Amino acid sequence: LFIYGASGAAVEIYDLAERVNVLSHRYSKIYLIDDFEEETQYYGTDRVHFSSCERIAKEAFEFIIAVGEPSARDLLLKRIEEKGYQLATLIDPSAMISPTAKIAAGCIVNAQSIVSSNVIMEKNCFLGFHVVVGHDAHLKRNTVVCPMATVGGGSTVGENTFIGLNSSMKERVNLGNNVFVGMGSMVFRSVEDGDTVLGNPARVTKGNAEHKVFRK
């Protein structure tokens, strides 16, 4: 397994992969990928460059993206797909997943999260710790839902959208693409593409033309 990233999110996903591997014994080795640092030992494993994968048969490994910035997840996903590499799906053993939920390749579901009945999670979604996704919700590609957040039943979350720590969405609320929901926000109304919302109740503060959550 190659974990694309070597930041704080990546080491959390490394721990998740180890927990999954205890039960599944799927991976003989778990690597971290970081093209901006030298290849060396990091967090008890090998940190390598993306190009290292070219020396291994494509069917012999899988990728998972461990980056919390939705636009970066989208970029890395396209890079992986262009190479024809396979995506893993990592679901913590402690997560509660409905048998009717549909979780696509590349998705991450962290510890103690709940994915309820008839939920659809498209490719490359990321759920943090203790996230609740209500029945019939639809999370589109590259959605990131941070720890302790709740997505109400029947809601739709657009592509490349970020839901901050401890935020909540009312049922049947729709978030557009490239939306940023700030930490601790309570979303009672639908949000248009590219908007940033904050507060309780959540109000639009500004657009997100750069489609960036984490800015230097």
What are these regions (language model features)?
Residues 8-11, 71-72, 186:
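Short alpha-helical
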Residues 20-41:
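NAD(P)-binding Rossmann-fold cofactor-contacting core
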